[in-house]
Amino acid sequence: NYTKKRLIAKNDVASLDVILGDNIRYNFDYYIDNGFYWSFGFNSKLTTFNRNITSNITDDAVFNTTANAINVDFFDLSNQAYLQTIFAQKFSLGGGLEFKVLKLESETLENTDPVFENSDYLSVFGFVKYDSFDKKYFPRTGWNFNSEIRSYLYSSDYKSNFERFSVAKADFGVAQTVFKNMTLKFQTEGGFAVGERSISYFDFILGGYGFQQVNNIKPFFGYDFLSIAGDSYVKLLLTADYEIFKKHHLNFSANFANVGNKIFDTIDTWFVQPNYSGYSFGYGMETVIGPVEIKHSWSPETKDHHTWFSVGFWF
C-alpha cells in the first residue's frame, strides 16, 4: 500500500494497493478534493481470480453443458473518471464514465472455445452516497446509504449479442448499540436490470464472504462464492455483534434473499418468503492491517457448511 498527498496538486491524494500471487490485483485511486465544489476522481482497478461459478451466470448456448458449476478464470480491468460534490452538506453526489475490459475463460470445457467472454464495455454512471458509521468494519452507531444507476452504451461485443441496458442498485444500513458492548446492525439492498436483454456477467451474483465486491458480485452467508445469480435481487442482513473485550468481537448474522430474472415485474415474485437464507457465527479482531475474521456459515436449504478466514483490509 502506498499513499501520497499533493502528488500533482496541493489538494489531491493518490493511493495504490497491490497484491501479487496467483490472483494479481491492484487498486489505484487519484482524487482532487475541492470541498463543496465539484471534485475530480480517477480509479483504475484490476481483479483476477479462478473459481467454480454457477452455470446460471452463463448462457447455455455458450457452454453447451448441463454442469451445475464451471471452473472459470476471471479478468476484470476497470478504469473510471468521475466528478463528485457534496449535496445538502451530507450526501456525496456524482457521476462519470467507465471503460472496462472483461475476460472469462475455462479450460475445463470440451469441444468449445475456452474463451467465452472477451469484450470491452463503456458505461456512464451516477451515484448518491451517505455514510455516518463510526467504523467501517465493526460499526457501533450510524447509518449509510448507497445508490447507483449505470448504463452500458457500447461493447466490442465478443459474442455479437450486445444490446444497451442499464443496472440500478441501492443499499441501506443502520447500526445501533442497544446496551454495553452489544450492537445490532440492519442492512437491506436490492437491484435490477433495465432493458430487453442484459449481459449475464453483470448479473447480481451472491455467495461467500470476505472479499471486495467487483461488478455485482456480493457476499451471502450459507452459500459458497458465486453460487446464486439473477438480473434482479433483494437481500436482508441482520447482525448482532458483541465486543467481548476491546477490539475483539463475537457476532451472529442471518441473511435472506430473493434472486432471479425480472423478479420486480410483479410483487408476488419478490415480496414473498425468501428463496435463499443463511446464517453465520464468527469471531473478529480489529488490527492495524484491518479486520481478522473467521466465520462459519450454513444454509437450511442446502445443508452445506462453509468456514471462511479473512485477514486485513478488503480490496
Regions found by a protein language model. Name each.
Residues 114-115, 120, 201-213, 259, ...:
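Solvent-exposed, glycine/polar-rich loop segments of beta-barrel outer-membrane systems
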